[in-house]
Amino acid sequence: MAKQKFDRSKPHCNVGTIGHVDHGKTTLTAAITRTLSTKGWADFRAYDQIDNAPEEKARGLTIAISHIEYQTETRHYAHIDCPGHADYIKNMITGAAQMDGAILVVSAPDGPMPQTREHVLLIHQVEVPAVVVALNKCDMMDDEELLELVELEVRELLTKNSFPGDEIPIVRVSAIKALECGCGKRECEWCGRIWKLMDAVDSYIPIPPRPVDKPFLMKVEDVFSIKGRGTVATGRVERGIIKGGDEVDLVGLHHEPRKIVVTSLEMFHKILDSAEPGDAVGLLLRGVEREDIERGMVLAKPGSIKPHINAEAEVYVLSKDEGGRHTPFFNGYKPQFFFGTTDVTGEIHLPEGVEMVVPGDHVKMKISTIYPVAMEKGMRFAIREGGKTVGAGAISQVLS
């Protein structure tokens, strides 16, 4: 069957659901698709279709990231359902990096919980610019004063993490009630609130300025081979434009950059003439074997980015209260550096006169990684240890 072409008539925006486990992120995602499907703007995706990565079934946890496509009257959205559980925060970091805005789901009966706080901190670290709040399970709360208290608590949490807590839209919903009803009418008590939420997303989450004119860059998230056609690399275009026939550099990890050709592009299983920043695409590549490319490498305009092992960085070390280390670290500390899609072990070199770094400090440091990673000034990374984020940084200067 011939593939349809991807429709670009509406501006595109990447959003995602975040929040504490069992507060209703996946149910809300299902309710959004159900409501929008009544206008033909989405394919309804049931809870278990969204919760569909293989390892999740056993534990009932959303581990992988589900990509859902839908439209409103004015926009086209790619929606990711982020994992809610702290064990899978690594995926959250790769996923949150793909969001122009977040829908923070908070259960009204429970209020903000530890993972709510962790996710809000994380989206601030990875610079997700805007948040809309879905106060879920409001069918279980009939006390107006209690609801107002929960809203206040959510606003305080957002303000504490440098978001404009007083301005952020908070929409009271019941994902389960909207899903059960499914009429999709604006005047319906519960379906209408899903429309109200999407109106808030449409108006409050800005369409990001796309860095179209910069040199092409895409971090490789996944790789697979298609029999008889070649190797496909998937990821999100960070900047620049890529077209079929373009030559790119494959950069990072184990060998010198090598030139390969992009033969064709797909998004949501539809053929694309060209891909722009923000597009989550699969690139069919010529001149590279499946085993020569892996998650953590980047595809870039030839000559535009180089692999490095040494850099200077500005780093904020999370305090104990923010979920960071409880004790200081010293020169020669060897954590993992998380660059976009991969963890790389490395070493920290503190400036002269700095004996140690205490949780809560902001410090300039040199970092070195055990193998080359595509790095450039301004690139953000996380510092991780034992499965948790202990610092957030940005490259201030590439050294070698």
From Swiss-Prot:
G5: annotated span: 174-176
Query: Which UniProt keywords are given for this protein, alphabetically ordered?
Result: Cytoplasm, Elongation factor, GTP-binding, Hydrolase, Magnesium, Metal-binding, Nucleotide-binding, Protein biosynthesis
How this chain assembles, per its entry, is: Monomer.
Entry protein name: Elongation factor Tu
What function is annotated for this protein? GTP hydrolase that promotes the GTP-dependent binding of aminoacyl-tRNA to the A-site of ribosomes during protein biosynthesis.
Organism per entry: Dehalococcoides mccartyi (strain ATCC BAA-2266 / KCTC 15142 / 195) (Dehalococcoides ethenogenes (strain 195))
Cited InterPro entries: EF-Tu_GTP-bd, EF-Tu_GTPase, EFTu-like_2, EFTU_2, P-loop_NTPase, Small_GTP-bd, T_Tr_GTP-bd_dom, Transl_B-barrel_sf
- Gene it is expressed from: tuf
**Pfam annotation, one family:** GTP_EFTU_D3
